[in-house]
Amino acid sequence: LESFFRNERIEIVDKALPRPGVVDVLKKLKDNGNNIYIVTARTDKHDDMPYERAKTWLDKNGIVYDRLIVGATNKVKVCKELGIDVFIDDQLNNCMKISQSGITTIRLTNSKEEYDHVVNMSNFNQIFEYICSLK
């Protein structure tokens, strides 16, 4: 069963498409002088090559980035070590932890629920405008 799950999950992830707008927005942010760090908790529990698979997917889909960090079970620590000043995620739990550490946090969601120090945005064009307004 574990082998089946691993193979099916890998196939599904490999075929997934990026969210609308993410490729263009990350390129514009990079062109504006921002560093782009991809921080994922993905580990080898269900994938024996998490870094390689993530890198292949990002490159295949034209997503620009400066550094890819996999296996980041403590994203707050990683963000602090890298000096990240804006964090984007769709997982509320991650957003809450990061925002409590003082990092500007954007949650990609359609939810109308509000949380202290977490900015909800529903698409990457909104995110781009918001980040530009911070400078």
Features from the language model and the residues they span:
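Anion (oxyanion) recognition and catalysis
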Residues: 27-30, 59, 99
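Acidic, Mg2+-coordinating phosphoryl-transfer loop and its flanking beta/alpha structural elements
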Residues: 84-122
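Short, acidic loop-to-helix structural element flanking the phosphoryl-transfer center
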Residues: 6-38, 46-52
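Structural recognition of alpha->loop->beta junctions
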Residues: 55-68, 117-135
